Structures are given as structure tokens and as C-alpha cells.
């Protein structure tokens, strides 16, 4: 009888990719994949440590798994595992601990546990490794859009961030391996790929001179893959957006006009304390370059509120800057004090109440700007990748995303279906953050 394994992911798209790769390795080894419910023989939890809340959720899911089946093997892997300083190795809810850069060994580690029945920890010194852990997927849970991990690690060491300690230094994936995966996904019917990594803008910086690659050269190569109609990019550092970069991207019709430029704060004083490598004027110039070459792209970002020593004036400067840029989406994070980072030792730590007030104010601005951007698309013809069938107000629709990553619904007909990309004239707002359009033609 096949062993049953249930998997659960916490955290970013890189984590999601790695969990899907582990799932496919387990399937190939003869395991049956089942929902994360009671009855599994093995539970694999891919943990996250980006905030204190992520740490707590990681611990909760591990304990939940053991409660669902006390006889099951519970495997903890991912970023929380890498940074918890061995605490999980003594946690009775956890049988196996698998650090980052060890996920490819999931099948062998489980087989070894079956023989020994002894709790084990497989963790390397992540900051010393130069090896990129080669994982691959042949399909994804999304069915129409595939996230592809091209890079791991980060060399930036922003003062608030624990991730370099969890992921190690920059390690880039060989371009040939990336392209092989893209070709396989294209043959499997995927029309959109999203290039993602821990610090995507650093792709290729660790390669030797004789095989130098950059993120731009990688995108150019992916652009040549037949069958792929859309290329989307994960989070970018502002510094990568030069005139050449923006111009070259705009010359590739597959590249979507949707860019996530990490900001964190619009206040120069705070940016300096954060050890960010740019200031607000430079960031604004990068946004203007993207608008110069893409017209009305969807610009999205991350902002931290309540960073140590952030005064009311500092917050207001950040708020005013975000307001001025007109982002489509702003992901707002209340500063989370991460043990081992420089910011954790800074004076001037703000209360949770102060952070909440600032977060709420920034969230109101985000909601207003999101609605404004969606309104700017009314009357336009957008290409929409249809992803699922939904029912809204008693009517059947296909729901998908435009190239700008805005949700658009079209009435269900026999002329097209999931994974088609019709040209849609957007007519109105159907629901908050869902536009409605009328199909013109299937591309």
C-alpha cells in the first residue's frame, strides 16, 4: 500500500515552488499525495521566518500535523528550520528537520527514517554554501501559470531582514536548466511563466566571467521559448531598472507590464537605517523609466511601517512618497523584530499600537490607489489569461488576469475556456478588484 503524504506551504513563491518540487519527487518515489487532513502517514511543512507571525504559524502547523496523526512522520523544512537555532530538534512534534538546500533529499531522508526510526536533523551552514540546489517542476497547482525559481540567497543584509541568514548567499541557477524547465512547461500547455528568486535582481552575479549571465539575458532567452506567451517577473530591486533594462524589456512583447519594485520606505532617513541601497529620488526615477517605456504599467511594492526610530515625520514622508508614485498595489508590513538582525538591537522600537495606526493609514491609501488604477483600465482592450470558472451573482464567468495582473471576468461561453487568452474590452467593475469585460477575439 502506498504511503500517504500531506504537504503544507508557508511563505513566499520560492517556498511554494520548492514544495511543489518536493511533492513531485515524493510522487515519483511512489507516495500518494493527500490533503492536509487527518489520515496521512507523512506531513511535510515548508516553514517561513520572514516575521514573528510566520514563525508562530510554522510552529502551529507542525503541532497541528502531529495532533492529526500522532503516529505520522512530521517533517519540518524551510526558513524557520534554518534560523531557529536547533529548537525544533527537541520539539516532540517534529520527527525530521530538513534545512534549506537539503530539500532535494526528501525521499532519501524519509527512507532512512523508515529504517532507523530515530529523530534526525539535516541542516547545513547555509551561509557557507555556494551550491544552488537544483529542483524542478513539471506542473503546478495553478495549471495555467508557472513560477520558476531561478536564484536563491541574498547578499544585501538589510538591517530588518532575517532572510540572508535563512537562505545564504546569492546562488544562481544555470540558464540551461532554467530553459529546459521552461520548454517542458510550455509543452505541458503553460502559457505564462513567472521568474522568481530570493533576490531576483542578483541573478548571475555569482557566475564566473566566462559564463556571465544577467537577469536581462535570462529574460531574453526565455522570450525565445515557443509556446510561452507571457513572462512575469518577481520582486525587483530599483537599481536594476536602468534605461537599457527598461528599453530592452519593452521590446519583448511577452514581458508583462507589471513590475514589483521593492521600496520598504519612502523616507530617506529610514532607508539609510534599513541599509537599502537607494534613496527616494532614485526610486522615483526608476518608476518613471518603466512608465516611459510601458505607458501605464502596474507598479506594485512593499512598505514597512513602524521601523525603529521612525518618527511621525518619517512616516509622513514615506506615506507622501507612496501617494505620489501611484502604485497599483502596496503590500504593507508592520515592522517585525527579528532576533539576530541589526534592527532588532536598535533603540527607538515602536509599540504595536503605533505600528497598527500607521499600517491602517497606509492601507487606506493602497485601497484608494488600487481602485484608481483599475478605473484607468475601463474602456481599454486587455489580454486576459483565463484561469478558472466562477459564479458571481448567479452568473457563470471565466476569471483570469490581464497582462497588468488585474483580475478580469468574462461571461462563460463555448468560444473559449480555461487557459485561453481572449482580447477583452473592459466595461465596468463587477466586484471590488474584479473588472468585467466582453470578449472580442481569442488570441
Spans of model-derived segments:
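Flexible glycine-/small-residue-rich
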Residues: 9, 197, 235, 263-265, ...
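Residues at or immediately flanking beta-strands
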Residues: 4, 192, 230-232, 258-260, ...
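Conserved strand-turn element in the central/C-terminal portion of the radical SAM core barrel
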Residues: 161-168, 230-239, 265-276, 290, ...
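Short, electropositive alpha-helical surface patch
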Residues: 208-220, 243-257, 310-328, 352-357, ...
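Terminal RNA-binding accessory module
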Residues: 345-443
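Conserved, mostly hydrophobic/aromatic
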Residues: 158, 178, 195, 233, ...
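Proteins enriched for Cys/Gly/acidic motifs involved in redox and nucleic-acid/cofactor modification
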Residues: 1-204, 214, 244, 249, ...
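Radical SAM/AdoMet-radical enzyme domain recognition
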Residues: 187, 216-217, 224-230, 241-301
Amino acid at each position: 500500500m502506498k504511503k500517504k503524504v500531506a504537504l503544507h506551504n508557508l511563505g513566499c513563491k520560492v517556498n511554494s515552488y520548492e514544495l511543489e518540487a518536493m511533492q513531485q519527487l515524493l510522487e515519483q518515489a511512489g507516495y500518494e499525495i493527500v490533503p492536509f487532513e487527518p489520515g496521512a502517514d507523512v506531513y511535510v511543512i515548508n516553514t517561513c521566518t520572514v516575521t514573528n507571525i510566520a514563525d508562530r504559524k510554522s510552529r502551529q502547523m507542525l503541532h497541528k500535523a502531529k495532533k492529526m496523526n500522532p503516529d505520522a512522520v512530521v517533517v519540518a523544512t524551510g526558513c524557520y528550520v534554518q534560523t531557529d537555532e536547533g529548537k525544533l530538534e527537541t520539539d516532540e512534534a517534529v520527527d525530521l528537520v530538513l534545512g534549506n538546500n537539503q530539500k532535494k533529499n526528501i525521499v532519501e531522508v524519509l527512507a532512512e527514517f523508515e529504517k532507523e526510526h530515530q529523530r534526525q536533523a539535516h541542516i547545513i551552514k547555509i551561509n557557507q554554501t555556494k551550491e544552488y540546489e537544483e529542483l524542478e517542476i513539471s506542473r503546478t497547482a495553478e495549471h495555467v501559470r508557472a513560477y520558476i525559481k531561478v536564484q536563491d540567497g541574498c547578499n544585501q543584509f538589510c538591517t530588518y531582514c532575517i532572510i540572508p541568514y535563512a537562505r545564504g548567499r546569492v546562488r544562481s541557477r544555470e540558464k540551461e536548466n532554467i530553459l529546459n524547465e521552461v520548454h517542458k512547461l510550455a509543452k505541458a500547455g503553460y502559457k505564462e511563466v513567472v521568474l522568481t528568486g530570493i533576490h531576483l535582481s542578483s541573478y548571475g552575479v555569482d557566475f564566473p566571467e566566462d559564463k556571465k549571465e544577467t537577469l536581462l539575458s535570462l529574460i531574453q532567452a526565455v522570450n525565445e521559448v515557443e509556446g510561452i506567451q507571457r513572462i512575469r517577473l518577481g520582486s525587483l530591486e530599483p537599481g536594476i531598472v536602468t534605461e537599457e533594462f527598461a528599453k530592452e524589456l519593452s521590446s519583448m512583447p511577452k514581458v508583462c507590464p507589471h513590475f514589483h519594485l521593492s521600496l520598504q520606505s519612502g523616507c530617506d532617513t529610514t532607508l539609510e537605517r534599513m541599509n537599502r541601497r537607494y534613496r527616494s529620488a532614485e526610486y522615483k526615477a526608476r518608476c518613471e523609466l518603466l512608465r516611459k517605456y510601458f505607458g501605464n504599467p502596474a507598479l506594485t511594492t512593499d512598505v514597512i511601517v513602524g521601523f525603529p526610530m521612525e518618527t511621525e515625520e518619517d512616516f509622513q514622508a514615506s506615506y507622501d512618497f507612496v501617494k505620489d508614485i501611484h502604485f497599483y498595489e502596496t503590500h504593507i508590513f508592520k515592522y517585525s523584530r527579528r532576533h539576530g538582525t541589526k534592527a532588532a538591537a536598535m533603540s527607538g522600537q515602536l509599540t504595536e499600537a503605533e505600528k497598527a495606526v500607521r499600517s491602517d493609514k497606509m492601507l487606506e491609501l493602497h485601497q484608494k490607489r488600487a481602485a484608481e488604477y483599475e478605473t484607468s483600465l475601463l474602456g481599454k482592450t486587455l489580454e486576459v489569461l483565463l484561469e478558472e470558472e466562477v459564479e458571481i451573482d448567479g452568473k457563470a464567468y471565466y476569471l483570469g488576469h490581464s497582462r497588468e495582473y488585474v483580475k478580469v471576468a468574462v461571461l462563460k461561453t463555448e468560444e473559449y475556456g480555461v487557459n485561453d487568452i481572449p482580447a477583452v474590452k473592459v466595461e465596468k467593475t463587477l466586484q471590488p478588484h474584479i473588472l468585467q469585460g466582453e470578449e472580442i477575439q481569442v488570441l
